[in-house]
Amino acid sequence: MAEGLERVRISASELRGILATLAPQAGSRENMKELKEARPRKDNRRPDLEIYKPGLSRLRNKPKIKEPPGSEEFKDEIVNDRDCSAVENGTQPVKDVCKELNNQEQNGPIDPENNRGQESFPRTAGQEDRSLKIIKRTKKPDLQIYQPGRRLQTVSKESASRVEEEEVLNQVEQLRVEEDECRGNVAKEEVANKPDRAEIEKSPGGGRVGAAKGEKGKRMGKGEGVRETHDDPARGRPGSAKRYSRSDKRRNRYRTRSTSSAGSNNSAEGAGLTDNGCRRRRQDRTKERPRLKKQVSVSSTDSLDEDRIDEPDGLGPRRSSERKRHLERNWSGRGEGEQKNSAKEYRGTLRVTFDAEAMNKESPMVRSARDDMDRGKPDKGLSSGGKGSEKQESKNPKQELRGRGRGILILPAHTTLSVNSAGSPESAPLGPRLLFGSGSKGSRSWGRGGTTRRLWDPNNPDQKPALKTQTPQLHFLDTDDEVSPTSWGDSRQAQASYYKFQNSDNPYYYPRTPGPASQYPYTGYNPLQYPVGPTNGVYPGPYYPGYPTPSGQYVCSPLPTSTMSPEEVEQHMRNLQQQELHRLLRVADNQELQLSNLLSRDRISPEGLEKMAQLRAELLQLYERCILLDIEFSDNQNVDQILWKNAFYQVIEKFRQLVKDPNVENPEQIRNRLLELLDEGSDFFDSLLQKLQVTYKFKLEDYMDGLAIRSKPLRKTVKYALISAQRCMICQGDIARYREQASDTANYGKARSWYLKAQHIAPKNGRPYNQLALLAVYTRRKLDAVYYYMRSLAASNPILTAKESLMSLFEETKRKAEQMEKKQHEEFDLSPDQWRKGKKSTFRHVGDDTTRLEIWIHPSHPRSSQGTESGKDSEQENGLGSLSPSDLNKRFILSFLHAHGKLFTRIGMETFPAVAEKVLKEFQVLLQHSPSPIGSTRMLQLMTINMFAVHNSQLKDCFSEECRSVIQEQAAALGLAMFSLLVRRCTCLLKESAKAQLSSPEDQDDQDDIKVSSFVPDLKELLPSVKVWSDWMLGYPDTWNPPPTSLDLPSHVAVDVWSTLADFCNILTAVNQSEVPLYKDPDDDLTLLILEEDRLLSGFVPLLAAPQDPCYVEKTSDKVIAADCKRVTVLKYFLEALCGQEEPLLAFKGGKYVSVAPVPDTMGKEMGSQEGTRLEDEEEDVVIEDFEEDSEAEGSGGEDDIRELRAKKLALARKIAEQQRRQEKIQAVLEDHSQMRQMELEIRPLFLVPDTNGFIDHLASLARLLESRKYILVVPLIVINELDGLAKGQETDHRAGGYARVVQEKARKSIEFLEQRFESRDSCLRALTSRGNELESIAFRSEDITGQLGNNDDLILSCCLHYCKDKAKDFMPASKEEPIRLLREVVLLTDDRNLRVKALTRNVPVRDIPAFLTWAQVG
């Protein structure tokens, strides 16, 4: 198909050559057609000619319509105008077209249909004469001239695909029917609008105009012919023109206007068409427009969107009479010196002429060449044309109108350099010609028929005028315009819609501001660098301090009115804005790199400081502009944090480092610089906070209530703006903190205030709590630090580094607790050695070994173990009661943090019950003080820490309601115990309030109910904490129901939680909470009631599941009493919820509430027994070495074999005894001959490790030790396995004696005892593996001991050694004369002699069970 279409292709220059030869003889189109078809084709090719378009040339062969007789009606206008050539159907006025073009110039891009009104005016003879002097110049195929501000959009396509060609042919076939109808309308209208021949004869080029009129009428009727078809005798063109080869490429045939000849193809779309004719012409052009997109050359610099702009959607009768009159006035007035008026009429708007000389305007080389040619060729133009001064006068206005334009110009790769006076200082801008006006098709729409678009002349093929001289530099702006030069942003604003897609990687895409100003016009570094900027059309100006108006291309570009839907327009604007933001960030990255290089130096010079200040100022402007342009983009890119890190944090740290450096010459100057930087940062973030509120239309005061969950959803921009505002406040707090540190002061009140404000804006963010914890660490308030670190971990976006901070805090607390305990011991004893002489605390082992001394300390002694108090509770109570409230509060805080340190680190949990007991004792004494040393806020912090301990210790991978870890149960038990003490205190205070109300005379009438207003102050301090804990219990019922295993506490400290709650419920029912009415629904005269504890704990993850129902009260009511009324209401609901549980804990019986909660131990036994019986049959693979040896000896072979084996056993025993005696003698000799140091073992029995014989022979004694609750019984797993084997016995042993059956029965009882105790989760009973791992249950007790060395005795001894952690720095004395002291908390209970010897050699205390019971005074 391409070959067939190629046969009908013809060049525009060939047509002009033929017409130039045949015009004097005959002007008929038939002769011209014959000559064209008979002309041979030449082989020389041009690299920049347009590829032949399928479907365009085929229309040339269609039959031509005859020229209507009325085609000369407009010739009288040509005589007066000298710039306009004949039009096809002269019925359409030109003035209206021009007027509408002017209107579109001010409002946006000119539609391509409006261009045709200007395309239809050919040039006069004077201009044609000048065009003959342009000759051909040598061009490079892909030469591209750089134009500032112009960016290639997409890669040009070389040719259309076969599918596209078929689609074009289908469209051409459809055009034929429509053009037939158009021909009829054209013929009728041309007859009706025939111009006066008398006026045509007055024009020197009248004959040519008529010929051109007829020819163009024929070709436009077809819609696609060769546009450059007419000849002019005055041009002197030779008869033969150059034919181009197959590979030649041509430019677009849809030209806007031509200056070459009256017969140019620019007259193809005349303004003289009737309304029907113009409408049909526009429809035809619209259907042909897709072919333009395929005429893209690789060497072209045109954007693909230039063709897209030429595709108008609605091409109806849009040329009003007003537009035609406006166009006629502007064009006809050019000959009478109205150029200046036209320039004034169109000033302030981007004006571009799309002639070749105007398109080359922005290139310095092109402009210089054009000015040289303008100076050297006016005479030649006159002599060649043979015209007089009248033509020269007509030519000058034409040049003035065409020579100037404003805007960003895009030159094709091989655009002709014009010889017109584009560079003339008196040339005025062409009024009707806008960016999308006459010639909006860009460089691709220019053909090769006009002299101003060609670098060569067929008459002078060897002459290259465009390359003779060097051109002067082009100016971007109009110098003759009477308005101020257009700024970079304005030019981009008028041009922006021309580039719909900005995805190219062309580095020339970003414009440069003409003149000496920089591309980024920052005002520099000064204290007040944020003045109010102008308005840009999308975002108001006051929010852009110190910035130029944003580029029109990005934020305020006029878009094509008919080519994009509103959604596409929005997306288009979004894409452009995203590109601007990315550009800003790229510039900021470059500035930050320079700033980092400056900061990396060891010393910074004064010039470096000034450069640093300038870079920081630019960074602040760039980052602030990004935040104010698109807050969502800024949040996704972390612009807020990058701003703080790059512009402030690294500079502050550098200055702080320099201030601390002793080698710095002038530290005071650096300190002053640091303070100035901090002051500047404070001003900047204050300003940014205000701009955020104004830009995104919100007020910070409306969101400072501290609510994490709001009833109405926030707007997306407000949500992101609040997050940015919170970060600004955190930065303000950091700046205030740095200022205090730089000034060597510790008043962090201002920083704390900023952090609290930030916390109120977004309570779910963990960063403000982390910063508040830092301040607490600086001021040595450890409870506040632990509280805020836990809040930062229990946030929706936690700060994970707080975990390490908590670990270090708890380690420090542990050291302080140990020091406090040691101090208490020293106060109790007169000297460190006095405690050794007490009869209860000293047990001296007497034996032959004089170098070994064991010091046994009874648990009742004050130094018995870590965390335990004296056995005399009354003395201890008296000791706590004698302390002042402040000292008692300090001691309680230390014990409380020590207990939670064990829960958090899970280290040292064996002493947790003792520490918890101490905490509860001190807390109980604290609550008795009035007023309470613990305020409302401090009490809320204590409850919050208890909630976090339960929340943090829950199983992460278990979602079953019944699964709770041991740590979680212990944490819940501690929290519930403190809650019960708190409730018990509230019950007492309520009774006091009732008595006070009865005694008051004004309340005699209402004696049954307790008024909320009569609450004592201490009760008002405690009610918020009780309410918060009840909220947590309602949100997480699985953590306390069924009730956790209670701690082993003394009777004076242990409190039944549920009985206490029942008593509290009974007294609470007498409280009248309706003293202030509460409402659920909002109203005009109501206000929302927010409790202080709810606001303080908002965003705390453990409380997010708690019910949060809004409550409203009257505006005139007392808010304090209303808050207490709400608390009482919530507590009543909570107590009723306890009665409504699936397994109720409270019940209403006999007119009062009672506790029906099950006993935790009993419930644990039931659950554990079921688990134990289920797994009992699985423990069949127990290996017991000693039992197998004894059973084989007793049950296999005859009596002779037994006697033989016993004899061997006795012989081996004698040998072992002899060896032991020998070793003892050797040891004695060695000890006598060596200077041996005495060893002291300080034994504080806490962990008791019995062996298998202990359970068989002394099970009752072990039970008594366990019931004493003073020791922890540790059972090695190998002992349990041995007991299992003994309890099951040997199935093949039918001759077992009575002793074996007795052993089997005792072993069975021992197993039952252990299972029962483990199932009840006895805190004083544990199982231990051979590797030292503690087990809370023995449901799974199989252990692989294949890799262990030694027998079962060695495994039992290894369990004891697990609790012997000797460190040389702890037991080695400073002098050689002092004995070595070892601390032991474990005691091995066994009667086995071999095991006792092994224990002694490893310095493990060992006793038999009866002796230990006697010493411990148990039973």
Swiss-Prot record:
SMART domains: PINc. Residues 133-153 are annotated as: EJC-binding motif 2. Residues 163-193, 567-625, 1197-1239 form a coiled coil. Its main location: nucleus. Changing D1251A: Impaired nonsense-mediated RNA decay. Residues 25-79, 99-165, 177-405, 419-472, 854-883 are annotated as: Disordered. Residues 1246-1397 form the PINc domain. It is found in: Nucleus, Nucleolus; Chromosome, Telomere; Cytoplasm, Cytosol. It comes from the Eukaryota. GO terms for molecular function: DNA polymerase binding; metal ion binding; ribonucleoprotein complex binding; RNA binding; RNA endonuclease activity; telomerase RNA binding; telomeric DNA binding. InterPro entries: DNA/RNA-bd_Est1-type, Est1-like_N, Est1/Ebs1-like, PIN-like_dom_sf, PIN_dom, TPR-like_helical_dom_sf. Residues 257-272, 437-446 have a biased composition (Low complexity). The PINc domain confers endonuclease activity and is expected to bind the catalytic metal ion. This is Telomerase-binding protein EST1A. It comes from Homo sapiens (Human).
